[in-house]
């Protein structure tokens, strides 16, 4: 024991502690990278990210290329508001650097006055410091102002660009229903964009200021202590920077995983809010609590690993970028003073040596701190690489979807019970859509889901304006799929589809969508008030649409057309369905798809609505199980759910089924 204790010096203990922490770091890093691939026995909530195509999140040429691509969006022109803020920040950074140099020189002179007991010098330089305080404070706060404004400008530019792509045509629908590369786009469009913009601006500031400091201090120090000192510091920067960059590589990937788990956690919470009524009826709070806790547990486990990794990296960063850098600084600045034969200080007095040492030492200290900040900025750059990878992936997916390309796991034809095993493979977009008025015609169209699950192998029928069609069949037979193909939400896998343009085809769902806005907005959606004026439709005509669905009283009840309410809560189920029919009368399409949209409406009101649709020339495709609606239709399309269908004219001999 005595032989062992003699090695337990403070120095050896510190080295052992550092080695132990480094070992823990490497072990924890290995665990963190493989943790969620092995530990979780449950599949992820939304496995939308392909395992074979993981996004790179390291600082390399790919990262710089991606960052450059996004910067062109955020700074679109040479002369723009963002450029002005970039110049303002650059000017303020230069001014702040010169303020720092002046503060060092003036502070040294104040201390020289105190040590030399010169009341006159002390008062003069102290007065200079007091006089400069407002200017220095103004520079610092102008810098903060420029940084905050630039963050906001970048966020506005990037958000507008992404939403322009996201809300183009049906891209927002395709991303969630046709493509499975992006999970939780709301997380990317809100939090990730904000964090990316903040990280870019902070990195610009955290790199520009230290570089300016280094250039200026090298110039000042070279004349004071020679070129060898600054060169030694730069060499140390290069070696330590390469070493720390290598250690920080997992940060980018861990950042991507953090945002992914945050998105999943946000998704399950919003899902609970959206479906709260159904969950309450099922008394499913315990099950939902298990789901939320399970997702939250994955997030917490990852954050624990990330926190420990950052702690370990912070320990190493502090030693290498701060303390060892300071030691190197002391070694460099002390050389001309400890060298008794150095020509610069051969004839210097004690006071001159002291003043020269303070000034050179503080400049070198500031330079070493600047070098340390550059080294530490690598950590933020690695984190930025994670956000950049996610934003770039979102941009690429949006671009693909807007060009009709999407990626989704396709169902194997051998897994199907339909005669599709011998059929040629389905290719999204292989069919042809022909726009023509007053006709809907399916010509040898395979009805299939986006992942290739065939519902009907070959669908063919034709409907002209004026001939209403009743669509019936069990759940999952393809009724909603038919409408999605008609609405061009789903791709056409083959054949020819003749139909009117999108604006001449209207869809009324069982649970109508009530937009945010006024009572008028509920009737004319998606039009606005200006669109209503352009169409020449007065408020009196709108009132007539409400009267047609027996909702005229709601105008007085809710306080007029410009009343703003939460209409999803204010209107009952039947009122919402009738409001959707009033919306249909406002738009007057050639064809309308009614998907169980009168299930909460009385039979007499329903009968009047269908009669009025025929009167105004709206041809209907109706999904309903009510026998009372057969009299309003000329044809029926029955799907049996096993890939078969029949399209026939309704006659007196037709057996009506339903309730």
UniProtKB/Swiss-Prot annotation:
Keywords: Acetylation, ATP-binding, Glycoprotein, Hydrolase, Membrane, Nucleotide-binding, Peroxisome, Phosphoprotein, Translocase, Transmembrane, Transmembrane helix, Transport, Ubl conjugation
Glycan attachment points: 12, 106, 206
GO molecular function ontology, one term from the record: ABC-type transporter activity
Name recorded for this polypeptide: ATP-binding cassette sub-family D member 3
Domain of life, source organism: Eukaryota
Domain ABC transmembrane type-1: 85-372
Subunit structure: Homodimers. Can form heterodimers with ABCD1 and ABCD2. Dimerization is necessary to form an active transporter. Interacts with PEX19; mediates the targeting of ABCD3 to peroxisomes.
Residues where Phosphoserine is found: 424, 659
UniProt PTM comment: Ubiquitinated by PEX2 during pexophagy in response to starvation, leading to its degradation.
SS bonds (residue pairs): none
A cellular-component GO term for this protein: mitochondrion
Binding residues annotated for ATP, in chain numbering: 473-480
One Pfam entry name: ABC_membrane_2
SUPFAM superfamilies per record: ABC transporter transmembrane region, P-loop containing nucleoside triphosphate hydrolases
GO BP annotations listed: bile acid and bile salt transport; bile acid biosynthetic process; fatty acid beta-oxidation; fatty acid biosynthetic process; lipid transport; long-chain fatty acid import into peroxisome; peroxisome organization; phytanic acid metabolic process
């Amino acid at each position: 024991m005595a032989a062992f204790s003699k090695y337990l010096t403070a120095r050896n203990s510190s080295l052992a502690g550092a080695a132990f922490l480094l070992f823990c770091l490497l072990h924890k890093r290995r665990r963190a990278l493989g943790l969620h691939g092995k530990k979780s026995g449950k599949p992820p909530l939304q496995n939308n990210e392909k395992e074979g195509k993981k996004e790179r999140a390291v600082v390399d040429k790919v990262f710089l290329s991606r960052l450059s691509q996004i910067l062109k969006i955020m700074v679109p022109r040479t002369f723009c508001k963002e450029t002005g803020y970039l110049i303002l920040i650059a000017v303020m950074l230069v001014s702040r650097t010169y303020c720092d140099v002046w503060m060092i020189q003036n502070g040294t002179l104040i201390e020289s006055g105190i040590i030399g007991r010169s009341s006159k010098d002390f008062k003069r330089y102290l007065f200079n410091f007091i006089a400069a305080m407002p200017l220095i404070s103004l520079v610092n706060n102008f810098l903060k102002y420029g940084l905050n404004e630039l963050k906001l400008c970048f966020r506005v530019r990037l958000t507008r660009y992404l939403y322009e792509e996201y809300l183009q045509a049906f891209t927002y629908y395709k991303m969630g229903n046709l493509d499975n590369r992006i999970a939780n786009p709301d997380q990317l469009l809100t939090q990730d964009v904000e964090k990316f913009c903040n990280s870019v601006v902070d990195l610009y500031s955290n790199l520009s200021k230290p570089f300016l400091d280094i250039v200026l201090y090298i110039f000042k120090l070279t004349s004071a202590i020679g070129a060898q000192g600054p060169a030694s510091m730069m060499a140390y920067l290069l070696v330590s920077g390469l070493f720390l960059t290598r250690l920080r590589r997992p940060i980018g990937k861990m950042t991507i995983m953090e945002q992914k788990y945050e998105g999943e956690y946000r998704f399950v919470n919003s899902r609970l809010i959206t479906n709260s009524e159904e969950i309450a009826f099922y008394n499913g709070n315990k099950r939902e609590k298990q789901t939320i806790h399970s997702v939250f547990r994955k997030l917490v486990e990852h954050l624990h690993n990330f926190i420990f990794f950052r702690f370990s990296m912070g320990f190493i960063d502090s030693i290498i970028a701060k303390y060892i850098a300071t030691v190197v600084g002391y070694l460099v600045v002390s050389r001309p003073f400890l060298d008794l034969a150095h020509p610069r200080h051969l004839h210097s007095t004690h006071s001159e040596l002291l003043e020269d040492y303070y000034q050179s030492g503080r400049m070198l200290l500031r330079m070493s701190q600047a070098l340390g900040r550059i080294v530490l900025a690598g950590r933020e750059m690695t984190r930025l690489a994670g956000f950049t990878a996610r934003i770039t992936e979102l941009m690429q997916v949006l671009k693909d979807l807007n060009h009709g390309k999407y990626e989704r796991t396709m169902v194997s034809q051998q897994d199907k019970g339909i005669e599709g095993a011998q059929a040629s493979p389905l290719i999204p977009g292989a069919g042809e859509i022909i726009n023509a008025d007053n006709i809907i015609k399916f010509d040898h169209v395979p009805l299939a889901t986006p992942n290739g699950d065939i519902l009907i192998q070959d669908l063919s029928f034709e409907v002209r304006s004026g001939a209403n069609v009743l669509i019936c069949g069990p759940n999952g037979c393809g009724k909603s799929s038919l409408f999605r193909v008609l609405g061009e939400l789903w791709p056409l896998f083959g054949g020819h589809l003749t139909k009117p343009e999108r604006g001449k085809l209207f869809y009324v769902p069982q649970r109508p969508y009530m937009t945010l806005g006024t009572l008028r907005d509920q009737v004319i959606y998606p039009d606005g008030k200006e669109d209503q004026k352009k169409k020449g439709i007065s408020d009196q005509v709108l009132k007539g649409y409400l009267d047609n669905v027996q909702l005229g009283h709601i105008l007085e009840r809710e306080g007029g057309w410009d009343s703003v309410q939460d209409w999803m809560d204010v209107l009952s189920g039947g009122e919402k369905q009738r409001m959707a029919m009033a919306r249909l009368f406002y738009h007057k399409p050639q064809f309308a798809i009614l998907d169980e949209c009168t299930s909460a409406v009385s039979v007499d009101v329903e009968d009047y609505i269908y009669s009025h649709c025929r009167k105004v020339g709206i041809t209907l495709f109706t999904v309903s199980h009510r026998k009372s609606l057969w009299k309003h239709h000329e044809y029926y399309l029955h799907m049996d759910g096993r890939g078969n269908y029949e399209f026939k004219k309704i006659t007196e001999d037709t057996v009506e089924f339903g309730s």
